[in-house]
Amino acid sequence: MAENGDNEKMTALEAKICHQIEYYFGDFNLPRDKFLKEQIKLDEGWVPLETMIKFNRLNRLTTDFNVIVQALSKSKAKLMEVSADKTKIRRSPSRPLPEVTDEYKNDVKNRSVYIKGFPTDATLDDIKEWLDDKGQILNIQMRRTLHKTFKGSIFAVFDSIQSAKKFVEIPGQKYKDTNLLILFKEDYFAKKNEERKQSKVEAKLKAKQEHEGRHKPGSTETRALEGKMGCLLKFSGDLDDQTCREDLHFLFSNHGEIKWVDFARGAKEGIILFKEKAKEALEKARNANNGNLLLRNKKVTWKVLEGHAEKEALKKITDDQQESLNKWKSKGGHAGGRFKGSHVFTAARRFKGKGKGNRPGYAGAPKGRGQFHGRRTRFDDDDRRRGPMKRGRDGRDREEPASKHKKRENGARDK
């Protein structure tokens, strides 16, 4: 049996091979990897290299046993062992896995970092390359939509709280000239919760104002419109089809508070309503981006609305909000609910109607069908796969060895 750790210099390929195998058997992945955990029970922890080369990412690097053995022999991590006949590998018994206790889970959470600002077509290898000199990373989770599209943000787990803190405190970090939003994972979720609370407060205030406005025709609406003059910013151009309202909130996050965005994904123009003057927010954002204010790396025409165009846009905003509120209420909702899209900007509340067992149902629910009750607890983010899993993927937490058809890292079939 040969242990790794020789002081020979690694080639770039050997370094990638070691990194990949040590990830598979590492503290973060192995406890979550059902397939590998089953394999290591069969032969005192040994896993045949014939099995390992079926793992997609290792398979793309090499299928040559000698190359793998040679690479592991040069690793300084001392995590892996190679069998005497050089056909099997295992995690060294002298490096047992940490016990997955609440304390351990809390430690992992404290060294996890949220990073946003990557292009949606970035690959796991692109992100790994960017993070290569940022500290030792144990895991990268690419956050995806329900349709498996990359959101442009990740969660990265560092090897220690100190290295995570050092990374977070680096000012002005960019990915290919794009500013990145970097927060500790716990701070990110706290920020999202605070935004939801603020939305609920604004929703209640808006509902109250609309209720009072019905008793004073014209007066409330007029005052509201006057208070928003100079606060509208129009944007237009050959926008990316994946451009969304969240991109605008991120772009102006430190320059002006956005109250409402009239924009639908796929459109080529839209309007932003700021709490304060739009001109000031635009100037601050431009100055922070060296005068070149892009949206998903696309050129955009920015224009502060004035005069007749401004009045018409404000009137449309008010009308759309009221129309959406009326439609929702007609389905059984109460004033003060939150609507997504280019309509009312308020927070969700309880719906009318009753579900199974005389419990509250949801607006527009089909009659005669039972509903789920209670709340579903989610961990990490809203992109976690549902249902039983044989193995995950390397960029998401785990990876499954390829069978007859190999898998891509985004879940599609390799060809």
From Swiss-Prot:
Domain xRRM as annotated: residue spans: 226-346
Modified residues (Phosphothreonine): 120, 377
Residues covered by the HTH La-type RNA-binding domain: 7-99
Coiled coil: none
One GO BP: tRNA 3'-end processing
Keywords: Acetylation, Nucleus, Phosphoprotein, RNA-binding
Domain RRM: from-to ranges: 111-187
Post-translational modification: Phosphorylated.
Complexes and interactors: Interacts with DDX15. May interact with RUFY1.
Name the UniProt record assigns to this protein: Lupus La protein homolog
Organism annotation: Mus musculus (Mouse)
